[in-house]
Regions:
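Short beta->alpha junction loops
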Residues: 32, 57-66, 182-184
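Anion-binding alpha/beta catalytic cores of soluble intermediary-metabolism enzymes, centered on
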Residues: 87-152
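ADP-ribose/adenylate-binding Rossmann-like module
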Residues: 214-224
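Single conserved hydrophobic/aromatic residue that forms the stacking wall/gate
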Residues: 1-4, 222-231
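Positively charged, low-complexity intrinsically disordered leader regions
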Residues: 2-18
Length: 231
């Protein structure tokens, strides 16, 4: 699914160039040297370069003040030749994450984390939906996975990922969704009865074979430090 989508985007951007149009541009703000964040960001940079998106990585020191970070975001909001940007999470403790998200222009919010964009999940007018959830829905559509009247277990209840995916699924199809978190006691029982399992906690090996019934569809959301052909 990912390969075909990239080919489509690459072809579309190539047509922009042929028509003399500006190619899409993206900035990624990375604060500090968080290992997992660096892995995610590097994957995003590679994906952008692969399809021809003009990508710019902005590396900031982890001792940056919230005010200074908000000033940088304001500059990105007002940059006319920039189509969108991402502020990679997590952020250092001196920075209020919600303040940062709230400061991002919804029109440039590529991750789809602002209240305006997340709120549009349940609206008739869809805006920039949370990117991970949109990716999951695209995979379901591309592989023609029938989810109508099926049961789906989502592992992870974060507002921007797990909860957002649950909302998208319930908006699109008649699917029964169970959202699990770290306090869920009967996790194995829930997953063993699920037709679809979506692990949205960013950890490999969380779902084991004894937790899955035969014929179930499994979607694992995480980036491995080393590429694997079986994912």
């Amino acid at each position: 699914g990912d390969v075909y989508k990239r080919q489509e985007i690459k072809k579309e951007i190539s047509s922009f160039k042929k028509d003399g149009k500006r190619v899409p541009s993206l900035s990624i703000v990375l604060v500090g040297n968080h290992t997992a964040s660096s892995i995610y960001v590097n994957a995003k940079v590679r994906a952008c370069k692969d399809v021809g998106i003009d990508v710019n990585l902005i590396n900031l020191n982890d001792n940056i003040s919230e005010l200074d970070l908000l000033e940088i975001i304001s500059e990105l909001n007002n940059k006319s030749d920039l189509d969108g940007f991402i502020v990679q999470l997590p952020l250092p403790p001196q920075v209020n994450v919600q303040n940062v998200i709230d400061s991002i222009s919804p029109a440039k919010d590529v991750d789809g984390f602002t209240n305006d964009n997340i709120g549009s999940i349940t609206s008739e007018v869809k805006k920039l939906l949370p990117a991970t959830g949109l990716g999951v829905m695209t995979l379901i559509e591309r592989y023609n996975i029938d989810i109508e009247s099926k049961s789906c277990a989502i592992l992870g209840s974060s507002r921007n990922v797990g909860a957002a995916i649950a909302q998208m699924l319930m908006q699109k199809e008649q699917v029964t969704v169970t959202v699990c978190n770290s306090k869920t006691k009967n996790l194995k029982e829930i997953t063993s009865n699920a037709d679809i399992i979506i692990s949205a906690v960013g950890k490999p090996n969380l779902v084991t074979s004894d937790m899955v019934k035969e014929g179930a569809v499994i979607c694992l959301l995480y980036t491995s430090p080393s590429p694997r052909d079986d994912l």
